Regions:
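A Zn2+-metalloprotease active-site environment signal
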Residues: 1-156
Length: 156
């Protein structure tokens, strides 16, 4: 998992960063890339039997189905980010901060590889509430807030 300086500068606090990292950890833990390649390969193999002029239709259908798999993986990664962070000192809904910031990009959800940001915030918040996770950082009085701000300044 790589964290780029632009992400650190973009986010407001360590819980937001922990939420994004937790989301990416879930992709690796749940083997989303491997699962998606297997699912798409199976569908493409099945659709290739159609043959003839229908080959283009089969390719387009395969791509649209792939988008749905990707959205499901994104939702699962959001859920596991909350589960991973719930027992920690970070807010379990830290990833929601990122989605609040980016807002809607205007792409219709059915053509996107990622679910709508507003839906993601709602799902993350629901998951946090269902698991009775903390609503606040457990280090707000500590040095980590200052350290995160100092890190952002150092990256300028």
């Amino acid at each position: 998992i790589y964290v780029y300086t632009g992400l650190i500068k973009y986010l407001d606090d360590a819980s937001s960063l922990a939420g994004v990292v937790g989301h990416e950890m879930a992709h690796a833990d749940k083997r989303h890339s491997t699962r998606q390649m297997t699912e798409v390969y199976g569908i493409q193999t099945l659709l290739s039997f159609i043959g003839g002029n229908a080959q283009q239709i089969a390719e387009i259908a395969g791509q649209l189905i792939s988008l749905k798999f990707s959205r499901n993986h994104e939702t699962e990664a959001d859920t596991y980010s909350v589960k991973y962070l719930c027992p920690t000192r970070y807010r379990a809904d830290g990833a929601a901060d990122f989605f609040k910031k980016i807002g809607s990009q205007g792409t219709p959800e059915f053509l996107s590889t990622h679910p709508d940001p507003g839906n993601r915030v709602a799902n993350i918040t629901k998951q946090k509430n269902d698991l009775n996770c903390n609503d606040t950082d457990n280090y707000t009085q500590g040095e980590d807030i200052t350290s995160y701000d100092q890190l952002k300044v150092a990256l300028q």
